Design a protein with these regions (language model features):
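Catalytic-core segments of hydrolase enzymes
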Residues: 1-64, 103-108
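C-terminal subdomain of the subtilisin-like protease fold in secreted/lumenal serine endopeptidases
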Residues: 3-4, 20, 27-30, 42, ...
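Short glycine/serine/threonine-biased micro-segments
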Residues: 10, 55, 72, 82, ...
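Short, electropositive, low-hydrophobicity segments enriched in small/polar residues
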Residues: 13-16, 36, 78, 88, ...
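Short pre-catalytic strand/loop immediately N-terminal to key active-site residues, enriched for Gly-Thr
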Residues: 40-41, 65-77, 112
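Short aromatic/basic micro-patch
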Residues: 54, 76, 120
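Short, small-residue alpha-helix embedded
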Residues: 77-94
Length: 132
């Protein structure tokens, strides 16, 4: 956007085709969740628009209190994959401009669920988009 920021938000975990905010705002990349089978997670909100794409959101290992680790589920685990990919796209030498990040993210893996926007995040293809 005009402030040089890529805004990414989780789509929500109501298992419904509803718009939640801030993901429903213009210019925000709204992220749904997929399973390890590349299918729509049962809990994820869905529908395009506003869902722009999906990323893994089930069984994501994360840090946990007292120096341990645990697996987490939810679109709040999906959105950081997209944020990290956007950072890689912007950080590449000669990388993408902020305005072209969404186009690169749209180079997602074409899983066959139109409710998940452009499909599942493909970090490699998104970063390669910046070098075309």
């Amino acid at each position: 956007n005009s402030n040089g920021v890529v805004s990414v938000a989780s789509a929500g975990n109501d298992g419904q085709q509803i718009m939640v905010y801030p993901g429903g705002l213009p210019g925000v990349v709204d992220v749904a969740s997929t399973s390890n089978q590349d299918t729509q997670s049962v809990f994820t909100n869905y529908g395009a628009p506003p869902v722009y794409l999906a990323a893994p959101g089930e069984g994501v290992v994360t840090t946990y209190p007292w120096g341990t680790y645990a697996a987490g589920w939810g679109t709040s685990f999906s959105a950081p994959f997209v944020s990290g990919t956007a950072a890689l796209m912007l950080g590449q030498n000669g990388g993408c401009s902020v305005s072209s990040v969404a186009s690169g993210l749209a180079k997602a893996d074409g899983i066959s669920d139109p409710q998940l926007g452009h499909g599942r995040l493909d970090t490699y293809s998104a970063v390669q988009f910046c070098h075309q």
